[in-house]
């Protein structure tokens, strides 16, 4: 049997070497790319190893290395984020209260490995709803509905203290805690509105009474002044006849000024002007 020898293709060894080099280069680039990861600003990273589990080290912002196929980077956002929770509960005097709480929450950066082991990456959804609702119900139940309004700042401080302490037990930091909503049942709201209207009417009535009292005092003072003036005039007339003449002259002057401004001409004698010769 005759076997024909396949002729060598010119350049085949070079092409084969080029292919091998390309494969090796591609694998090298893949390994390099897989062994690097970036941590953006405001984030932190922890690394999970398939053999040893979560490492205790927390990686800051920047580029870091890991073992491809054996290690995986887990990124956490450590910036403060708002979270709002509304709860319906009852006050000490059995009034229905709807209260809303807003918190700025973030994970404690140096506790990320423990957070991942116990809560995972969605730590906020696992912890915050329960501790906020329990705290709101416990604190609101200590106050009457009216005190929740008048002592709102004290209520807010107490809620902030309890929620912050409970969140810290789960390695969660709260940068701000504030009451955003406070509503009551329909009956209590109507009672408050009626009370406010009654208070306004009482203030208005008080003002009217005080004004009437002031007017009364003013009238008395004015009457006393007029009586005193009449008394003094009477004494002046009795003691000095010249005072009567002076009053007549003043009256005549006023009459003359009035007539001077009139368009009609009027002739008056001295008796009409209340002036007579002595």
UniProtKB/Swiss-Prot annotation:
Keyword Membrane found: yes
* Entries under CDD domains matching the protein: SPFH_prohibitin
Q: State the GO CC annotations.
A: mitochondrial inner membrane; mitochondrion; plasmodesma
Q: Which cellular compartments is it found in?
A: Mitochondrion inner membrane
Spell out which residues lie on the membrane's Mitochondrial intermembrane side: 38-278
Its membrane topology is listed as: Single-pass type II membrane protein
Name recorded for this polypeptide: Prohibitin-7, mitochondrial
Source organism of this protein record: Arabidopsis thaliana (Mouse-ear cress)
Q: Which gene encodes it?
A: PHB7
